[in-house]
Amino acid sequence: MIRSFTGWRYIFAVAIFMHHYQIDGKSVLQAGGVIGVTFFFILSGFLLAYGYKKRLMTREISTSDFYKARAVKLYPLHILCFAAVFLLGIRNFVTADLPKAVLNLFLLQSWVPSPDYYMSYNAVSWFLSDELFFYLMFPFVLPVLLNGSGKKIAVGAGIFAISYSAAAALIPSDHYHAYFYINPLSRFADFVFGILVFRIFDQRRQATVGHTSRAEAGAILLVFATFILFDHIPKPYHYCSVIFWGPVAMLIYIFANTSLSTNYPPHTRKIHYVLHKSVGPHRKRACRYKPDRAASFRKDCPVAPYNCSEKPVFVFI
């Protein structure tokens, strides 16, 4: 784990939370969801490549061991949240809901292009559904992306980006969310791009040491400019993550060797994950602001589910 990302993970987790926080039915930070999720998918590819490059490619660990470790990362909190939401709504459960429950439980709901499925139960678990697909593909795409011809990969990435952007402009607007924001195949591009960012970082590792504060400030300003200009981006591209690859990649690349996380508690990188995944069960109720009853948010709220679900399981990894 590159510690310099802990702070940024926390910042983008808060951005996603603010995206779900509404005042008078309007999101406080509309860009927080799209850009925040893109950041986490790209960072996921980067960090997995960083942590598993040698171990997988030298067969220090097997593919099955990798899958076991990832399953432990995904499922404990997911099952806890799923059970909580399921039990709260069990009185309204009907037989017709069974397929949704099964797909959600096994993190397959994102493959069905219908909000009734991918937003069922703990709605934000669609993110985990995508991550599950990424993890399954990771051992196979890693050697190809790290050892393949740089020119061929660059040409392929360019062709994909152009095709992806064109598709975003042509697809009916009512399909944007399902096919570009949620679908695992579409978001897999973010994950792959994160691995490619790691490839560049790894090849220029010595050159990345000692980045100037000017470069860091430039990366931060570029990301904030993206947030500010988000509303001016044509709506077809709001869910087209290719638009945000540049700013996010620059941020990750430049801060790969900094120590932004040194002022954060050791468990913060775990807490951001719990915060993101636990927004769903209560977001409609707790994330709407009313003048007579302001919703409150305490930074220690996610600590309990982390200590009760993920932390005990990590002992066995």
Q: How would you name each of these model-derived features?
A:
Residues I2-R3, K26-V37, D116-D130, L170-F193, ...:
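Interfacial loop-to-helix transition and helix-capping segments at the boundaries
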Residues V14, L43, I79-L87, L136-F140, ...:
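Generic alpha-helical transmembrane segments of integral inner-membrane proteins
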Residues V34-V37, F41, K54-G89, A96-L107, ...:
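Transmembrane alpha-helical segments and their boundary/interface "anchor" motifs
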Residues F191, G218-I317:
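Alpha-helical transmembrane segments of multi-pass integral membrane proteins
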